[in-house]
Amino acid sequence: MATKQEEQANLSDVLTPSMSLTELEMKFADETDGKAKDVVQARIKKAEDGILPLRLQFNDFTQIMSSLDEERYANVSKQEKFQMIRSKVLGLTERLQELSNDFEELQPLFATVGEYSKTYKNKNFQVLENLASYNHRGKAGASISNSTPTPAAATPTTAPTPGAGTKKAAKTAPTPTATATIGTPSNNAPTPATTATTPGTQAKKPRKPRQTKKQQQAAAAAAAVAQAQAQAQAQAQNQNQNNMQNKNISNPGMNSNMGTPVMGNPNMKQMQSPIPANAMNNMNVPHNGAMRPSVPNGNMGNPSMGNLNMNAPNMGNPNMNNPNMNNPNAMMSPMAGQGQLNQMFPMQNHNQNGQFMGQQSPGPNIGQMQFPPNNGNMNGMPGTSDMNLGMNPSMNMNMGMNLNQITPANILSMNTKGKDDQMQNIGMDQNQNQNQSQNQSQNQNQSMNMNMNNDSNNPKSAYDLVDFNSLDLSSLNMDFL
């Protein structure tokens, strides 16, 4: 034990903390104290010899830990296993601690290796790891590690040739410090990898508008298709409406909302006078031109009540003795003035002379109602409750005929014109009735048969639009004679 303590004392005197290379050389060169070199060599030999037993002891410990479940340890109790493992661990830690103490005592010598390589330009000795962190002395170890430069670990270990090798070593000598400072945490310079990747990520952003263009094109195509479909639907709806209107015009008996056709003027095909639906549905005028009110006494009510029964207690005989009633041309003209009926369904009552019995109230001014020359008779129909106006084109209720346009030639052509239009409309009625549903076709066939029977019974009243025997030409413009 004394010898071991003496060796430690001698080694501590030789290898002092923060010792420089020159001081170590001076101690080794002192002839008076020639034991210093021998003491350092003996301690290095001891540390080197302690490495192999430590490795063998560690291998034994790992083998025992891996074979605890084998059959050879089946009869061993758990307590014995615990004690065996504990002894192996303690022996391993003791051997490791001895090796650590030997390296710690030699730490001042290892610190001079880097300085030796720089001074003598010899790289035969390069420390792979600095053991200053394992120094339990604290400040001394820290001062040693800070004072000595850290050698580069990537430098080759081959010995250079004398002569030219020294020049190459002089040129490459600063490389260890340069390589050491590049990887230190104190260097805050950004690495080139981060600067290189940033433009790469930003260069990918312009690709997004390409996708948006495709999406915009797809959306525009979809919008165009939708717009074309909407236009096609609108055109189909308009065509259907036009077809329905054409059917209604060609067959006025099918639509209760159609106006009264005008057949007196050769220059005008037909004029429509809008009449409320409830009034048109409840009115019917046969080919003989007589209006048939639903009330037996021939009274006519207010159309605002939804019914065309017009209650006129002072009318008495339905024959109306208005001077203009005997003149069908005056009734046909919208310019007849005082002799025309300005409102079809007035709100007040009439007497037999066509005079108003009360104050005129605002009512629906539907149009000028024109009666055919049938002596103004209004035949009562007690079996019905409403007035029904038939929408056959042959009915004698013509609207708005101007007397100034009537000439002898027009008077002669009115009869033939009415016959041609009547036959054309009857043919169109028959074609339209075939395209309707079964229930509507049956009803219209019945109405057509009734109209044809009336025409056959009284052909003169059906086709002769003007009765020359009852014409009053006193109000005609005779300038053309």
From Swiss-Prot:
UniProt feature, compositional bias: Low complexity: 148-203, 214-248, 428-458
Molecular function per GO: transcription coregulator activity
Superkingdom to which the source organism belongs: Eukaryota
Biased composition (Basic residues): 204-213
Compositional bias segments (type: Polar residues): 249-259
GO annotation terms (biological process): regulation of transcription by RNA polymerase II
Keywords: Activator, Coiled coil, Nucleus, Transcription, Transcription regulation
Protein location: Nucleus
Coiled-coil intervals, chain numbering: 79-107
Subunit structure and binding partners: Component of the Mediator complex.
Function noted in UniProt: Component of the Mediator complex, a coactivator involved in regulated gene transcription of nearly all RNA polymerase II-dependent genes. Mediator functions as a bridge to convey information from gene-specific regulatory proteins to the basal RNA polymerase II transcription machinery. Mediator is recruited to promoters by direct interactions with regulatory proteins and serves as a scaffold for the assembly of a functional preinitiation complex with RNA polymerase II and the general transcription factors.
Sequence similarity: Belongs to the Mediator complex subunit 3 family.
Annotated protein name in UniProt: Mediator of RNA polymerase II transcription subunit 3
